[in-house]
Structure formats: structure tokens, C-alpha cells
A protein has these predicted regions:
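Glycine-rich phosphate-binding loop signature in dinucleotide/nucleotide-binding domains
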Residues: 131-134
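Residues at the C-termini of beta-strands that transition into short coil/loop
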Residues: 41, 111-114, 166
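C-terminal functional extensions of proteins
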Residues: 145-196
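Redox- and metal-dependent alpha/beta enzyme cores, enriched for Fe-S-associated oxidoreductases
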Residues: 84-127
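Electropositive, gly/pro-rich neighborhoods at or near active sites that engage anionic ligands
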Residues: 1-102
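Structural motif
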Residues: 89, 136-137
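Gly/Ser/Thr-rich loops at beta-strand to alpha-helix junctions
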Residues: 41-44, 96-99, 139-148, 169
Length: 196
């Protein structure tokens, strides 16, 4: 446990951002019956997976894999989640270079953010809270900022769905500059993670 905690602190010490580091930690420790966190898997991360779960202090029922939408699940994600997005009023938080016109679903509102958005665009959290939206589906494609958004927006307003979907839209948004293995039938596209 101590190793994982130290690893988190070491990772963010180089940015000298104690405030944002604390917000990231709060996002993994926040508890609510309708709030779920994604953790790394033991097959890819060994003991770090157990350390992360223990560090979060979450009930196991409120945990899933951080990569639940990718790897061997990506084709399922595209056939189910991606198709269902047209049934919602979508608010998308993604990189400012995103080509949202390529998406296979409509967006009601796009919030462009920069790289290191969890620091550079942190004020967006309060801006969204002030709008007091209802019945919206917020999709986060913004790195660690997605964790902060999901936590703080859910804590403030439980009348929406907040979903950190990571890199799943990158084939359409094309903001990352490279292709991930699971998009192109590579090794990870067949990778099946095991919980224990």
C-alpha cells in the first residue's frame, strides 16, 4: 500500500501541484452508491492493482477496470454504448483539437480543453456546476481531468450521468496523434483482464 501511495505522490510532485494531486486522490476515494471507479487490472499491473483497490477504500461493488471499454471489450463498447449515445443529450469534454464533426452521434455541447486539462482547465468544473443541468450524459475524454470531473460533478448534481470514456472516441476525434493497439486488432484488442 505504501508503495502505491508513494508512486502517486512521486508522479505528481514533478508538477508541484499539491492541490490538483489532492483532488485526484479525492476522486478515487469519493463514495456514493451510484459512483464507480476504474482501477488497473492485476494481469497487466500485478500488485499495483491490489494496492490501488485498497488505497481507494471503495466497496468492491463500486469498482471496475479502468480499461472496461477498451481492449477486448472495445467492439462491445462500439456496438452498445456508442450506439446508445444518440438517445441522450451529450455534453462532451475533450481536447480542443478534437474533430467532433466525425463523431457517429450528436453532441448538444462541446467543452474544448487543453492537454493537462486537470490543471489548465480546472475552472470548467465550477462553470458546469453553475449551469445545474439535468438529464444530460457527460462524456469525458480528458485524461486525469475526467476523474476530477466525474467526482465533483456527481457530488454536486446527481441528476446527470457522468462517464469517463478515456480514449474510446479517439478514432473519430483524432486529437491524440497516434492509434492505440486495440483500435487496429492488435495484441490488446484480444486482451481479457481478470479481476482476481
Amino acid at each position: 500500500m505504501k508503495d502505491f501511495t508513494q508512486e502517486i505522490y512521486n508522479l505528481f510532485d514533478k508538477f508541484k501541484t499539491l492541490f490538483y494531486k489532492q483532488k485526484l486522490i479525492e476522486s478515487i476515494k469519493y463514495k456514493d452508491s451510484n459512483y464507480y471507479i476504474g482501477t488497473c487490472c492485476p494481469c497487466c499491473n500485478g500488485d499495483r492493482a491490489k494496492q490501488m483497490r485498497e488505497f481507494s477504500n471503495q466497496n468492491e461493488d463500486n469498482m471496475t477496470f479502468a480499461n472496461v471499454f477498451v481492449n477486448s471489450n472495445y467492439s462491445i463498447y462500439k456496438e452498445t454504448f456508442l450506439k446508445s449515445y444518440n438517445n441522450f443529450d451529450i455534453h462532451l469534454i475533450a481536447n480542443e483539437k478534437s474533430k467532433i464533426e466525425n463523431l457517429p452521434f450528436k453532441i448538444e455541447k462541446f467543452y474544448p480543453v487543453t492537454f493537462s486539462a486537470w490543471i489548465n482547465n480546472y475552472s470548467l468544473i465550477e462553470e458546469i456546476k453553475q449551469q445545474n443541468f439535468k438529464n444530460k450524459l457527460f462524456l469525458f475524454c480528458a485524461g486525469p481531468f475526467g476523474n476530477l470531473l466525474a467526482h465533483q460533478l456527481h457530488e454536486s448534481n446527481k441528476q446527470n450521468i457522468y462517464l469517463d470514456i478515456g480514449s474510446t472516441l479517439n478514432p473519430w476525434l483524432q486529437s491524440e496523434g497516434f492509434k492505440r493497439d486495440y483500435y487496429v486488432n492488435g495484441y490488446f484488442s484480444k486482451r481479457k483482464c481478470i479481476w482476481n
